[in-house]
Amino acid sequence: MMRARFPLLLLGLVFLASVSVSFGIAYWEKENPKHNKCLQSCNSERDSYRNQACHARCNLLKVEKEECEEGEIPRPRPRPQHPEREPQQPGEKEEDEDEQPRPIPFPRPQPRQEEEHEQREEQEWPRKEEKRGEKGSEEEDEDEDEEQDERQFPFPRPPHQKEERKQEEDEDEEQQRESEESEDSELRRHKNKNPFLFGSNRFETLFKNQYGRIRVLQRFNQRSPQLQNLRDYRILEFNSKPNTLLLPNHADADYLIVILNGTAILSLVNNDDRDSYRLQSGDALRVPSGTTYYVVNPDNNENLRLITLAIPVNKPGRFESFFLSSTEAQQSYLQGFSRNILEASYDTKFEEINKVLFSREEGQQQGEQRLQESVIVEISKEQIRALSKRAKSSSRKTISSEDKPFNLRSRDPIYSNKLGKFFEITPEKNPQLRDLDIFLSIVDMNEGALLLPHFNSKAIVILVINEGDANIELVGLKEQQQEQQQEEQPLEVRKYRAELSEQDIFVIPAGYPVVVNATSNLNFFAIGINAENNQRNFLAGSQDNVISQIPSQVQELAFPGSAQAVEKLLKNQRESYFVDAQPKKKEEGNKGRKGPLSSILRAFY
């Protein structure tokens, strides 16, 4: 009988258990409406990864509620999953699901399957097209939408959108490139390819402030291996405004200073005395290595510009300037000595030395020190008058002094006519230049004048444009490859052309024929390296023409034309040195006839 009742008893127990579970679930759902709502919102997520993450957050919500009930620990309210945001309560920190990381109990899945990828593309592309259609032609909003889409959806942009965007970017880049190239493109091309041209951008600024600047030119041999013999020479440019002073300093290099514009009081300090000179445009003076000097611009209106040829004595092509003064741009070289050395040298406490020479007392802050901003400072008129009392003017009568300044225009020009004047001082005439094996030249040319083709026998000439503009043409030989067929290859000439303006520098190697055409009133200054016994050979003109000195028998063999034709051609030019740059009209009989000078001269045309 018990066996007959056992199944009925078991069935009753199962029924009671199911009813209890049903009531328990209903009660739990009633007590946890947020969890239920969270689960319902998860059903709307089609992406499997986001669906799993949503369920994980709902489970965390349940755990947080249970822990809160057990320990009575307040927890932040979970963010609703629907798009609308609830109003932010005071003191409640806003959380962003995309920005704030949440604990995810599942590892981030690997790249999606192809089916999911295709399904996602079908969903997202129409959305982007719809946004683009709503924005119309507003480019800024269009770019913002595209960037937002790319951040939200890590899928490739549709092919047609990629092509359109790439095409727009290419067009913009092409327009920008064309506008940049159109601006002085031809001039930049010549400057970059011409190894003998040094534009203003080839200078490096050493010191600069509102009163002036000091710049040094790039090393010559860094520009071209053809200028290897100039590796020991550097060019400095100094500019200063009126009523200014370059603080005392010395360098480990011999200086040859030339005044290009303005007036300067240049003082050289010796062990027992000092020499001060009032220098004008065209004056030059050698400053031996290690000599302390300073420069004043005493003029009230005109700026001072000078060029310095520096010949280092310690390292080839490298030199240093040592300033006595301590400034924000340069420490005094005295500060390099130890404290006890300074105290013993001046028999004074270091604190006093520091205060007097370096403008800093021990314990002073950086902002409290009284330092000059740079090595070029302003000077009062009273101080200028005091410094000018002992200044001597350069002599225009003598150029043979061993230590006094000389003027490049002190003698008559070596070449002169109505179109230009050429002044020059050679090492044979000046001991200062003889020690350095240098000649100095200064040239004035009228607009439209042409300095006839010529070459220097051994001097390398550094030409500095001071005022005006010019076109210059230099002729060299193309480099030939060292091969067995070299004997069969003809030697070809190469023309280096440049448009020069103020502050440009051009180097003329020895033996390279050169011609200068002034496109405006022109003034330039030249330094000749290896100047002793240099000879300037002209290739045209009635005087000093090297071609006219060649015997007729050799001319017959050297040129296609006869010796009589060569002589006649050379005599056509009655002027010398400076001529009109506009060629004269030829007679009808000479038209079409090949000229006899077809070698080097042909490279100038």
Curated annotation (Swiss-Prot):
Biased amino acid composition, Basic and acidic residues: 111-136
Domain Cupin type-1: 196-354, 406-567
Entry-linked Gene3D superfamilies: Jelly Rolls
Entry GO MF terms: nutrient reservoir activity
Pfam families tied to this protein: Cupin_1
Stretch list, region Disordered: 65-195
Glycosylation site residues: N261, N517
Biased composition (Acidic residues): 137-149, 169-184
Keyword Glycoprotein: yes
Propiece residues: 23-62
Keywords from the named record: Allergen, Disulfide bond, Endoplasmic reticulum, Glycoprotein, Seed storage protein, Signal, Storage protein, Vacuole
Secretion signal, residue range per the UniProt entry: 1-22
Record's subcellular location: Vacuole, Aleurone grain; Endoplasmic reticulum; Protein storage vacuole
Subcellular location, principal: other
One GO CC term, this protein: aleurone grain
Function, in words: Seed storage protein. Accumulates during seed development and is hydrolyzed after germination to provide a carbon and nitrogen source for the developing seedling.
UniProt subunit comment: The alpha-, alpha'-, and beta-subunits associate in various combinations to form trimeric proteins.
Family: Belongs to the 7S seed storage protein family.
Name of protein: Beta-conglycinin alpha subunit 1
Organism: Glycine max
Lineage: Eukaryota, Viridiplantae, Streptophyta, Embryophyta, Tracheophyta
